[in-house]
């Protein structure tokens, strides 16, 4: 799905809007520090990483799309700040512990949300945070019909909160990052920050 889109991904107007809003939410709602080691899960071409990188020490960009990550490593501003991992962390953990795991619009591509959140907890230091953004529950019209790799039509916030709590997260705070207009419909995107207990 993402191989043919990788080259032009950064030019997509909706992607630009999402990047600006979600990175703004991360910067405004997470106390980013120069010593932080951050995982960008579902990093894609590194748009969110590019915005967060100046505020932290190092970013590990994780994605299963090699073509997306190739676009990421070509970015000059990320050259000395980012390492890339093309792997599925549910079956192949990174072996590191992070101060923050951030993820933008990747969770609806993950079949087992509960297990993914469990893996996030396992990869975080105690007291570290997750900062996640994805679609609020929608009617399935956001993505084209029959598209591969889309397992959820967004999420109910209370159900997502329950998954976070079940996997040891506290201080859970949701905001609306932005509302995406698409083909005469509006799709709210939530942003949630939570702390590993």
Regions found by a protein language model. Name each.
Residues 1-32, 47-48, 71:
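Conserved class I S-adenosyl-L-methionine
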Residues 102:
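A conserved beta-strand element that flanks and buttresses the S-adenosyl-L-methionine
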Residues 105-106:
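Short catalytic micro-motifs in class I SAM-dependent methyltransferases
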Residues 1, 10-16, 50, 131-193:
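C-terminal alpha-helical "lid/dimerization" subdomain adjacent to the S-adenosyl-L-methionine
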Residues 39-91:
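Class I SAM-dependent methyltransferase SAM/SAH-binding core
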Residues 35:
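Phosphate-coordination loops involved in phosphoryl transfer and adenosine-cofactor binding
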Residues 114-129:
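A short glycine-rich, Lys/Arg-flanked "PGG" loop and its adjoining helix->strand segment in the class I
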Residues 27, 50-53, 117, 121:
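A structural alpha-helix within SAM-dependent methyltransferase catalytic domains
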């Amino acid at each position: 799905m993402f191989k043919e889109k990788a080259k032009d991904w950064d030019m997509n107007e909706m992607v630009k809007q999402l990047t600006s809003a979600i990175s703004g939410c991360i910067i405004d709602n997470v106390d980013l520090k120069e010593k932080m080691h951050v995982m960008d899960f579902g990093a894609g071409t590194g748009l969110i990483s590019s915005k967060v990188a100046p505020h932290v020490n190092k970013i590990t960009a994780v994605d299963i799309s090699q073509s997306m990550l190739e676009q990421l490593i070509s970015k000059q501003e990320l050259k000395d700040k980012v390492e890339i991992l093309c792997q599925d962390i549910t079956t192949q953990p990174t072996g590191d512990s992070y101060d923050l795991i951030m993820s933008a619009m990747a969770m609806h591509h993950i079949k087992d949300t509960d297990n993914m959140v469990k893996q996030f907890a396992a990869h975080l230091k105690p007291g570290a945070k997750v900062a996640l953004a994805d679609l609020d529950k929608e009617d399935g019209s956001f993505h084209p019909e029959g598209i591969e790799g889309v397992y959820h039509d967004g999420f109910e916030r209370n159900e997502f909160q329950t998954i976070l709590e079940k996997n040891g997260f506290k201080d859970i705070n949701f905001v609306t990052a932005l509302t995406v207009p698409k083909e005469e419909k509006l799709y709210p995107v939530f942003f949630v920050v939570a702390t590993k207990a």
